[in-house]
Design a protein with these regions (language model features):
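Glycine- and small hydrophobic-enriched segments that form the cores of compact globular domains
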Residues: 85, 112-119, 131, 135-136, ...
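Well-ordered alpha-helical segments within folded domains of soluble proteins
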Residues: 118-127, 175-180, 228-234
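Acidic-glycine-rich active-site phosphate/pyrophosphate-binding loop
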Residues: 87-104, 139-158, 202-211, 246, ...
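Conserved phosphate/anionic-ligand binding catalytic regions in large, soluble enzymes, centered on
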Residues: 107-125, 169-174
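Glycine- and acidic-residue-rich phosphate-binding/metal-coordinating active-site segment common to enzymes
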Residues: 144, 150-163, 167-177, 182
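Generic N-terminal targeting/processing segments that precede catalytic cores or assembly contacts
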Residues: 1-108, 130-132, 241, 248-290
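Alpha-helical support elements that line or immediately flank enzyme active sites
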Residues: 123-134, 182-187
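Functionally critical mobile loop/hinge segments
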Residues: 184-290
C-alpha cells in the first residue's frame, strides 16, 4: 500500500520494475480482497463503457436542458476538414472528452473517472493514445490501472469532489491521472509520470466549480476538453525530462489547501462564478422557472 506519490514511485520501481499497473492490482487486493482476474474483468468493463461513451457522444442531439449537445460532432467535422491549428492527437482527445460529457448530460452511461462531471478526460486521453501509440488491450487496461493508482493518492490526500475542492479537484484530478498514465503508456518512468501530475495540478490550482443552473454541463463539458489537452502537454513536458521545482506530494497538498479555502459559492453550489452571471441566471430561469 502507498500513501503518497513518492511511495508509489518507490514501490513501483523497487518491487514491480516500474510497472504501476501491477502495483495497483496488488493494492486493490490489499484493499478489497479482489483477485487479479476479477480486477482485470472489472477494469475491462470500465474500458468498454468508456469507449462506448466516446462513440455515442458524437450524437448531435441536445441535452434535456438544451445547454449542451452537438459540440463533439462539430469538432469532429472540423478535424476532418484538415484545417485545424492544433495537433490531431490532442484535438481528437478534446473532441472525445466533449463527447463523453455530452453523453453524460443526456443521461448516457459513463465511467466516473474520478467523477461523472470529469468523466471525459481519461477516456478521451486513452482513446486518443490508443490511436497514436497503438496500445494493445493489455496496455489499455494498464493505462487505467495506473491512472487509478495515481488517482487514489489524490483522492486520499486532497479531493476529487467539486463540492469539497472546486473544479480543480474534479477536472484537475482527472487531467492529472490521465497525464500520468499517458507518460507510462509512452514508455516513461513512474517518476516522469509524477512530474506530469505536477504540471497539470499547478495549472489547475484554484479552478472553481460554478455549474450554470446547477447542472453538470456549462462550463463542465468544455473544461473536460481543456483537461484532456493539458494531459498531453504535461506528458510531453515530463517525457522531455522537465521536472517540477515543487515535489508532487506538496503540489497535491496545496490543491487540498486551496480547495478548502474556496468560498462555498465556488464549490458546486451554483452561487458564484459563471452560474451567477446575467446569462447564467437567465438560463437557469429558462430551465427551472422562477
Amino acid at each position: 500500500m502507498f500513501y503518497s506519490i513518492k511511495e508509489l514511485v518507490e514501490q513501483a520501481d523497487l518491487d514491480y520494475q516500474g510497472n504501476v499497473a501491477e502495483l495497483m492490482i496488488a493494492t486493490e487486493y490489499e484493499l478489497t480482497g479482489r483477485e487479479r482476474d476479477e480486477v482485470l474483468r472489472l477494469m475491462g468493463r470500465n474500458l468498454e463503457v468508456m469507449k462506448a461513451s466516446v462513440l455515442l457522444g458524437l450524437d448531435e442531439s441536445k441535452s434535456r436542458s438544451g445547454l449542451t449537445g452537438g459540440d463533439a460532432a462539430k469538432l469532429d467535422h472540423y478535424i476532418q476538414s484538415g484545417k485545424t491549428l492544433s495537433d490531431y492527437t490532442v484535438l481528437t482527445a478534446a473532441k472525445n472528452a466533449i463527447a463523453v460529457n455530452e453523453h453524460n448530460a443526456k443521461m448516457g452511461l459513463v465511467c466516473a473517472t474520478p467523477t461523472a462531471g470529469s468523466a471525459g478526460c481519461l477516456p478521451a486521453v486513452l482513446t486518443s493514445a490508443i490511436e497514436k501509440l497503438g496500445l494493445s488491450e493489455e496496455e489499455q487496461l494498464n493505462f487505467l490501472l495506473a491512472a487509478g493508482a495515481f488517482g487514489l493518492v489524490i483522492a486520499n490526500n486532497a479531493s476529487i469532489s467539486g463540492a469539497e475542492g472546486g473544479c480543480q479537484a474534479e477536472v484537475g484530478s482527472a487531467s492529472a491521472m490521465s497525464a500520468a498514465a499517458l507518460v507510462l503508456a509512452a514508455g516513461g518512468s513512474p517518476f516522469q509520470a509524477s512530474q506530469a501530475i505536477c504540471f497539470v495540478i499547478k495549472n489547475m490550482l484554484g479552478l472553481i466549480c460554478d455549474p450554470v443552473a446547477g447542472l453538470v454541463e456549462v462550463p463542465c463539458v468544455k473544461r473536460n476538453a481543456m483537461g484532456a489537452s493539458y494531459a498531453f502537454i504535461a506528458a510531453d513536458m515530463a517525457l522531455a525530462g522537465i521536472e517540477s521545482k515543487i515535489p508532487v506530494d506538496e503540489v497535491i497538498d496545496t490543491m487540498y489547501q486551496v480547495g478548502s479555502s474556496l468560498p462555498t459559492a465556488f464549490r458546486e453550489t451554483a452561487e458564484g462564478g459563471l452560474a451567477t452571471t446575467p446569462t447564467g441566471r437567465r438560463l437557469s430561469k429558462e430551465i427551472f422557472g422562477e
